[in-house]
């Protein structure tokens, strides 16, 4: 994890260097969540840097076509990371603002009628357009909207404490 995360918080998919499709906000969010679940303290400098970058790039439906920017993959892992990071300095406020933007982004874009009622169009989302389609976009959007019903941060943190010595 350390080798795959730059000092500015940007993360890469593998330690082979930055290549196309292997970096971006989605990877940053995955890095943040993974580091936290592996015991990194929520108030560490890296956690704070990554949280600040995510907070500055909230979910935005119109920007979903950006491969390395604000897409559904990023929104999902960003939602998990910021929810788990609520106990860090400023974390509750970051999560609250993110969650408001997430709902403002997702709910108006859910199909309200017809045979596709309840689903989410792939829209301009890069990964949905690259093959995931309606199933991908609907699954991720539903998982994001129910995130606080499925994950209890204290449970995740209690298991992460066992791994905290790895980061010392």
Please describe what each predicted stretch is:
Residues 2-104, 112-157, 164-168:
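An alpha-helical repeat/solenoid feature that recognizes helix-turn-helix modules
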